[in-house]
Amino acid sequence: SSVELMRVVLANVGSAPLTLTPTAAVPIFGRSADRARDHRHVTSLLHRIATHPYGVVVRPTLTFDERGHRFNTVAYAVLGAEGDGTAPVAVFPTLETFVGSGGSLDWPQAVVEPGLTGLAAGRRLAGYEAMGGLRFGRITLDPGQRCAYVLALGILDDDEDPEAMMARYGDDARFEAWLTRTKTHWDQKLASLQVDLGEARFNGWMKWVTLQPILRRICGNSFLPYHDYGRGGRGWRDLWQDQLALLLMEPGEVRDQLLSNFAGIRLDGSNATIIGDAPGDFRADRNNIPRVWMDHGAWPLLTTQLYMDRSGDLGFLLEEQEYFKDSWIQRAQAVDGSWTPEDGTKLRNSAGSVYRGSILEHLLVQHLTAFFNVGEHNIIRLEGADWNDGLDMARLRGESVAFTALYASNLRRLSALVVALSQLGVKELRFFAELVPLLDRLHAPLDYDSVSAKRARLAEYFAVTEHTIRGERVAVALQDLSADLAAKADWLYAHLRRQEW
């Protein structure tokens, strides 16, 4: 069930009897968070509201979408009962009936104005903002006496019955049983990773940090309708950082998800920014807002390294995966005019077949393109999305010393991993031919001190990978590949120490 349970306990902490009429109130928005900004009124007209013995059920007629409206298949319910299962005596199913004339949600007349009786079960209304206003029977609490109420906030499919939901959750004893089950579930989730640093508050905070990636998978990121940032989906960093947590907590699912994530990498070293719900579901950005972050190429290796360290699965580097392809090329600085949406979002070779490369090849694409993509100080450049606050505009001349250091460390890691592949009997690796010129130590070493030489080499690579690649593969010996990566890492380390430290 998609249900949130809430228990409210009223206690008389005074010295005299207290008489009151308890009222619970939960607004029912009942549609996409987008409608908080666009078409709020017209979508409220779609609401079909029913009063139920235990509360309010809203079933909109349509799911509003200007690209094509769809019949709605879910209902939104706010139901409640006293601790012993007794139903409310009346409900206020709309914002208008709950707030009253001249009232507000801070001072609703249904609560403060005598004589507003609410509606009984079995009433139907249409076209209003919905409200889960539940009035319970008038009670008198003696000093020290307590009274509990249980609320069930649910999203129901067509075949789900509100009565069944209340039978399952709707009294104090059932609430307590489900609360115990819920605590046990999350305690077991968190038990796989425990941190004790001798300070109780910090240990508790670490439990919350451990829990966050799981909640993010369930809820998305900034999913609140009035939040400043985000629409509930996950970004590129989230994919890899969430995998880090899952490696420690739920490692069984990680390998397939990790492999799927690599399908989002473009051949220019950037990556898809619109991420679907299913693993490996990456979509073309058609809103004409190219977004590239310079650090995005660094994170996949860190997650992959932890996976291999924990599993010993070095052969993962040899698994093959597709590349992402859309209209953006040259790290979103240009558009591939030959690409159309009908071409799909998978890189193809000149014969029209989908190209698949090893995971190691994907990692090389990310790191080699970053190595040559330098600014005037020979430090890896910032990209347009790194400074998008409308003021700094560091994309034009900005460089990042911190992430250059991370890429340097990663190149050293890659060099060591290449050597380690010999343990599997591997002697050479094969990569698409257009990538090999970026391994310049194999044929014609570049002067790494020359910014112009690096930029020219990267431009040559971009030019031959704009739309498709030939599909030819070139063999590279492990030792030669490792030496090239080590040379790049060594140069970056020395350059940073000499110029930036």
Describe each PLM feature range.
Residues 1-114, 165-192, 327-330, 334-341:
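Polysaccharide-binding surfaces and accessory modules of carbohydrate-active proteins
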Residues 5-7, 33, 79-177, 388-406, ...:
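Beta-strand-rich recognition/accessory modules
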Residues 39, 162-164, 274-275, 314-324, ...:
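Short, glycine/acidic-rich hinge or "gate" loops at secondary-structure transitions
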Residues 117, 134, 139-140, 145-231, ...:
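Acidic/polar, glycine-enriched structural segments that form the non-catalytic walls/loops
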Residues 144, 239, 246-254, 258-376, ...:
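Aromatic-rich carbohydrate-recognition surfaces in CAZymes
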Residues 216-224, 273-291, 382-398:
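Acidic/His metal-coordination segments adjacent to aromatic residues that form catalytic metal sites
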Residues 316-382, 386, 401-402, 437-501:
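Extended ligand-binding clefts on enzyme/binding-domain cores
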